[in-house]
């Protein structure tokens, strides 16, 4: 029970930090902002071995993203996006967990995960509310730059989280 409570608290803190960073970060490159909540979700997926923890975190991340979205009508697409992304990233990248370096794993997870997330978000938004431009145009101008930014920022945060967890939990 204690381990589950500790895991729940840590995951909640990561999600909260991701949402706060999303809100206070100004655009960096051509109006693009790193999606800190998505980066934190990927960190949680890498730090947790069980699917139940990851999918419940994905649901909460979707609800938080829906609450703070700036995309018109993006609430439901955000929820769908986070749940699908969490499931696919967990399943697809789990076999490589102990076979590659943590930093490389985070870079791959962030790149693959952001592309999945952006595709699912745009696809579900297209079906549910429509898009202000074509899927292809939005994918090229929004998702691909966000993928690069998230890979860099997510890896930096991941390294900091791993170091701080080693100090705090003396691992």
Curated annotation (Swiss-Prot):
Disulfide bonds: none annotated. Its main location: membrane. GO terms for biological process: amino acid transport. It comes from the Bacteria. The chain crosses the membrane at residues 9-31, 58-80, 107-129, 139-161. One of its GO terms (cellular component) is plasma membrane. It is found in: Cell membrane. Keywords: Amino-acid transport, Cell membrane, Membrane, Transmembrane, Transmembrane helix, Transport. It is a multi-pass membrane protein. The keyword Signal does not apply. Belongs to the vitamin uptake transporter (VUT/ECF) (TC 2.A.88) family. TrpP subfamily. Probably involved in tryptophan uptake. This is Probable tryptophan transport protein. It comes from Clostridium acetobutylicum (strain ATCC 824 / DSM 792 / JCM 1419 / IAM 19013 / LMG 5710 / NBRC 13948 / NRRL B-527 / VKM B-1787 / 2291 / W).
